[in-house]
Amino acid sequence: MFARHPNLLWLNKQLSILHYLCLVFLAVYYAYPLLFGIMPRKLQLEDENSFVIMGVADPQIEGNHKIEANGFFKGTLDLWGNDLFLRHLVHMNQFWGQPDAMILLGDLVSFQHLDNEEFNKRAKRLKKITGAKNFWQVGNSSLPARTFENGNIPVWTIAGNHDIGYGCESSDAQISKWEQAMGPVNWVSHFNVSKFPVRVIGINSLSLDDVQFYDANPSDIINSKSFSSLGILALSKEARDAWQFLFDIALEPSIPTILFTHVPLYKPANVCVDEPRIVRQLDFRVKSQNHLSYNTTMKIFELIPSIKLVLSGHDHMGCDYEHPNGAIEHTLPSAMGYFGGNIGFVKLIATNDVLTESSKNTPSVVTFLIQKLIGQRWKKASLKQSKFSSDIYATYTLSHGGPSYIWWALHISVCVLTILRLLVISLQHI
């Protein structure tokens, strides 16, 4: 029949080529985490001696304000599309990386002054996006072993400035709204990597700088009665709660620790895209900030010197930094937006019985591997080494899926080309 319609035959061939190319690109896009070394754990020798944490920063889920600004149809369609893309990012990386736990590093919603009803709606959408039945209700809890095998991994949450506001905006109402939907703002949890214990701490970083520091000669922390002995004057209940929480943690036995914080720790200028800046009100409470202050950062490390790794958000472009005390901080770039599509992985691996002979003979018994992207060039950057503990080494990998328009372009192209090919084929019967 196409012989009678040579133009249709030519058109069908061109559409077929484009169609198959789009299908190939789409298949590659759904396997893109493999390009960054995110692969099924059963293919890796250290499977039984590792613990994997998947990090998502700054999704900033929108809601009613988008609909009010753009109209019901356009706003609803936009929200649906954003949720669909974010769910794709999370589930594809979860499928390939098989994490034991997930951490949402703050700015989970787009506006800190939502009423309870709207906030709960967005929290419900976030559960659907992440696949969480409930956000992990941590206290001083321990995680069950091999949680990824049943697909029901714990999802930890950290509050960001778009969730509860900066220090001057925090209140009992803001904290209560967050904790009812997302869990505690300050929490600690424990897990084992093989037989070796690891502690993770989540902190309300928005209130940590709502303090004034003064000179003090503190006694031994273990023998002190309150954090005031460290020269800290809290300016709000939230700041007092956050610092008291850190002080209580300092009294616990010291084990290797990972700190989760929305606002990154202090770094010198020109290290990250965001400069170390804090804007304060006349009453000294924090109005906005890029990093935690130098004093706050030093006090945290003074209280909990066992912090070896820090994961943070807030700086949408991301940053990697080794603090003077040797702690490594990874600020995850944003999961959404033009610079979005980023998911981070930290894998902690016990050194016992899993290293090859060549690995055992390396200069550093414990290695810290950083696989990082440069912009959107999709290529690996330099490697760095650092020590996590005498029994555990860690790898950090950043998976980059690109902005949402790539995902949409591929899906729409496949749909349009499929329809066009069916239309051309149907024309042969005319």
Curated annotation (Swiss-Prot):
InterPro entries: Calcineurin-like_PHP_ApaH, Metallo-depent_PP-like, PGAP5/Cdc1/Ted1, Ted1_MPase_dom. The keyword Repressor does not apply. Gene3D superfamilies: 3.60.21.10. The chain crosses the membrane at residues 20-40, 405-425. It is found in: Membrane. One of its GO terms (biological process) is GPI anchor biosynthetic process. Keywords: Membrane, Transmembrane, Transmembrane helix. It is a multi-pass membrane protein. GO terms for molecular function: GPI-mannose ethanolamine phosphate phosphodiesterase activity. One of its GO terms (cellular component) is endoplasmic reticulum membrane. This is Uncharacterized protein C23A1.02c. The lineage of its organism: Eukaryota, Fungi, Dikarya, Ascomycota, Taphrinomycotina.
